[in-house]
Amino acid sequence: MSQLTEIVEQALAAIEGTEDLKALDELRVDYLGKKGKITDMMKMMGKLSPAEKPAFGQAVNQAKQAVQKQLSERIDNLKAKELEAQLVAESIDVSLPGRRIDNGGLHPVTRTIERIETFFGELGFSVKEGPEIEDDFHNFDALNISEHHPARADHDTFYFNPKVMLRTQTSGVQIRTMENEKPPLRIISPGRVYRNDYDQTHTPMFHQVEGLLVAENVNFAELKGILHDFLRNFFEEDLEVRFRPSYFPFTEPSAEVDVMGKNGKWLEVLGCGMVHPNVLRSVGIDPEKYSGFAFGMGVERLSMLRYGVNDLRSFFENDLRFLKQFK
């Protein structure tokens, strides 16, 4: 028994003096492992009389429990010290000023296009896209634009050759849709268009959204109602809107749409009209059976009016001071 007591005292003293978790595990193996010192004491059972065995066995088990308890407490203590040291080393000074997180934001032109798509999507219009390099049939001929119309001039259009050009409007998407799909049709076609112009209110590339509805018994009153609701929704105001007679080769009758600005002056925002019968014929649609209306708007112009931007070129200069205002 004295030998067992001595082994337990050695184990407890060694555990208490250990400052390393790895060393503690080695002590556990030395005393409690399969070949450990306390485990070896059980081998002495064979030398004891039957009367001595119960008391000795109980003493060995108590020794194991005492050493195991001391080991567990020491391990917990050392782990707590390690955590405390780690927290001190990794402490955060909450009094330091925060660092700004620069989140991205949508470009104002993208915001405007999404707003337009959302409104017309709720009315059942689908979004269609088409090529930006266009042929003269889809860009001019099918739209009832005559060979000598000013829009075909070199100073207005970027030509690759006399038959191929950068599109000047997204109307070509409408022509392609009418060629491939049968009425009734209800589409909008957002996209980039190109014209040879550059000043405070014009850029060589800009964005346009055009709309088309073709079905039976379509009339101008429907067009007025939809555009009136759109403008009020887009500007989030009960705007005064007027339709002013105008001329476009691809619509008849045609109109330009103005809204009353805060300065008391009328501002032009889009063009529209009933689809010209010649346009319907060019894509194989019978104008005696079907009619339709079309409209087109410059996205940058609408963005300028909505956000109070004075120079259209600001949208393309990538000035972060300007763009961060729209986050």
Swiss-Prot record:
PROSITE patterns: AA_TRNA_LIGASE_II (PS50862). CDD domains: PheRS_alpha_core (cd00496). It is an enzyme of class 6 (ligase). GO terms for biological process: phenylalanyl-tRNA aminoacylation. Binds 2 magnesium ions per tetramer. It catalyses: tRNA(Phe) + L-phenylalanine + ATP = L-phenylalanyl-tRNA(Phe) + AMP + diphosphate + H(+). Its cofactor is Mg(2+). Mg(2+) binds at residue 252. It holds the Pfam family Phe_tRNA-synt_N. The keyword Nucleotide-binding applies. GO terms for molecular function: ATP binding; magnesium ion binding; phenylalanine-tRNA ligase activity; tRNA binding. Keywords: Aminoacyl-tRNA synthetase, ATP-binding, Cytoplasm, Ligase, Magnesium, Metal-binding, Nucleotide-binding, Protein biosynthesis. One of its GO terms (cellular component) is cytoplasm. Belongs to the class-II aminoacyl-tRNA synthetase family. Phe-tRNA synthetase alpha subunit type 1 subfamily. Tetramer of two alpha and two beta subunits. This is Phenylalanine--tRNA ligase alpha subunit.
